[in-house]
Amino acid sequence: MASRFMTDPHAMRDMAGRFEVHAQTVEDEARRMWASAQNISGAGWSGQAEATSLDTMTQMNQAFRNIVNMLHGVRDGLVRDANNYEQQEQASQQILSS
């Protein structure tokens, strides 16, 4: 399976689609978490407690953003590699047929 995956552009693109779905899920959950934290923050928290909560949420949001960027990087790499593999495969077939 793993060796076929590395030489199957369709499987690579399918996997890229899965990474996109994962990235979207992480983004959606981070958005929900941020909205929930905003509701808590507006519910009577003030001063140092509110600032600490906001700082923590900002750090967590950045961590989720990093995860999304990493997932998108893998997705983009898989699509790029699938395209390169197909181009090389076509070039090889042309050379062999001439």
Curated annotation (Swiss-Prot):
Family matches, as InterPro entries: ESAT-6-like_sf (IPR036689), T7SS_ESAT-6-like (IPR010310)
Domain of life (superkingdom): Bacteria
Subcellular location: Secreted
GO CC list: extracellular region
Keyword terms: Secreted
Record-linked Gene3D superfamilies: ESAT-6-like
Main location: secreted
SUPFAM superfamilies for this protein: EsxAB dimer-like
NCBIfam families referenced in this protein's UniProt entry, alphabetically: WXG100_ESAT6
Family (UniProt): Belongs to the WXG100 family. CFP-10 subfamily.
Identification of the protein by name: ESAT-6-like protein EsxM
Organism: Mycobacterium bovis (strain ATCC BAA-935 / AF2122/97)
Record gene name: esxM
